[in-house]
Amino acid sequence: MSRKMLVTCALPYANGAIHLGHMLEHIQADIWVRFQRMRGNEIYFVCADDAHGTPIMLNAAKQGITPEQLIEKAKADHVADFKGFNISFDNYHSTHSEENREITTEMYKKLRANGFIKSRVISQLFDPEKQMFLPDRFVKGTCPKCKAEDQYGDNCEVCASTYSPMDLINPRSAISGATPIVKESEHFFFDLPNFEGMLKEWTRSGSLQSEIANKMQEWFESGLQQWDISRDAPYFGFPIPDAENKFFYVWLDAPIGYMASFKNLCDRTGLNFDEFWKKDSETELYHFIGKDIVYFHSLFWPAMLDGCELRKPTNVFAHGYVTVDGVKMSKSRGTFIQASTYLKHIDPECLRYYYAAKLNERIEDLDLSLEDFVQRVNSDIVNKLVNLASRNASFIAKRFEGKLADKLEDEALFAEFIAQSEQIAAHYENREFNKAIRLIMDLCDKANKYVDDKAPWVIAKQEGCDAQLQAVCSMGIELFRVLMSYLKPVLPQLAERAEAFLQTELTWDNIQQPLLGQNVAPFKSLFSRLEKKQIDAVIEETKALFAAQNKEKGKQKVENTENTAVEPIAAEITIDDFAKLDLRVAKVISCEAVPESNKLLKFQLDLGDHQRQVLSGIKAAYNNPEELVGRFVIMVANLAPRKMKFGVSEGMILSAGTGGADLFLLSADEGIRPGMQVK
């Protein structure tokens, strides 16, 4: 019996380009959706741009355009990238749509009527220059606990303390630099704790990934909190009904964007929207997401749906991050690759295959090893799969006018290939794509061994062996057809070219139907080898792209610094006070971003006779920390080690500037050595 399913991908933020990290999720979901279609299931695949929030509002203002213009351009770019990678969405929409506004407003009113919306007056920092309330991330100042400077408004990344933005010492607006004032404002909260029982039951259902279920248990033990779903004007988003100058927080209307995109599809095609979203729906709902947004999709989203008497997701499938050559994607190394850059140089099917060969059902990071990428694509797709067709097709075309034999040369081998159909299907269904690829390639090896053993090039030279030659080559092509059918969800473009050659549609139902006595088209090249020079071209273009961006940012940084008022000189100290500081020259051995922190870089420093680890809050100023390797810095060497949230920091690196992106490391003339004392 055919299943009815709705599948979504997380909504890309309309404030930046699609990169290969995004593509992992969309390729994973697309393979799963294409497989379900091949199995005859009724499935709909939708997505949208996440188009609201303060960052979009500020970026648009910076560019001198409206937020609507910004998100329109982003959507066009995103759609082109996904089309380039053959992501087969049935609909791609935007959260800044009439459908989303209507559904968001309706759900809010339902939650309010059911008693799940609370309100209370809170105190917030307000930028008097920009005339706007400041979200926590747009307030910076000195930590009230450890006195570390340039900390965000909700937590210190040096001592890991949490606090209110009002507790910051010398707070300033990260937008204008102005000193904020305190103003009161009424905010609206979603009563998440009310849904703890339902969420626990949903967690125990056994359908969620074990990693998600375990993480949810940790959140339950920590205690669920009411969720602030409102933001004050100015804000780019939907206004809250009956609340002047209040807007829905972006994370409220973002997941509702799944519903809005599907509603847009339903309105265009006549599908029954309610059938998929009503509380007792018998359809299936799946969300593919990254591990960084599990919190919203496993707590807030199902609770909101339940509070509105709607169905909950059947499952939430989370995946890990993409690394390149074992490390985080890097702009300076050219591995922070945008989808559009990749598509200029490399066939998208290459990446689809490589990701599929490594994807499993767990929440694990996937490493794109560039050397392995080239080797695996050429070995599996070109040398094994496509070569299987080409080495047999030439004989069929030249000697038999494209006509295949009337019967199978090796029925047992064909039956062995067909027998793996349900196992391969199970691997696809369970998102164990790596296992499916491994099994398919094992069959591909057997198919090539069959051809090697039969040696049609030898048979072709023997008198009176035409029937045997036709049978062997037809068998090779038949096995290629089966393999291509299994790989169609992963390689849709190659499958389309194979269908043109075989003159038949590749479906799961007809896998076991051999092409006996039928004609195939003249063979044309199906796939090109992946060359290292193509990888190099992508890397170099990526480096150039971000070098140009950094140059422009550096120019703006200098201009901003020149226009910044000089801070007043601090109170006088004695020479004895200064003598207490032991300043040393240190050489940077390694430097990397702390993934869990918005601010910290982790340095390994050489001080001549020993090494130290130092955590420094200069991440915003140095987007490419690996470029600092080999550089000399000045550090306070006799500062007591400090145990921080992300490790122990054994000193302090000196820098100048007002904070955030306006920080500059101090350096010295040539000839200095690690460990030299600064006097």
From Swiss-Prot:
Keyword Nucleotidyltransferase on entry: no
Positions occupied by motif 'KMSKS' region: 328-332
Cofactor: Zn(2+)
Any one of the GO BP annotations: methionyl-tRNA aminoacylation
Any one Pfam family match given in the protein's UniProt record, by short name: tRNA_bind
Keyword Transmembrane: no
Chief localization: cytoplasm
GO cellular component, one term: cytosol
Identification of the protein by name: Methionine--tRNA ligase
Protein's organism: Actinobacillus pleuropneumoniae serotype 5b (strain L20)
Lineage: Bacteria, Pseudomonadati, Pseudomonadota, Gammaproteobacteria, Pasteurellales
The encoding gene: metG
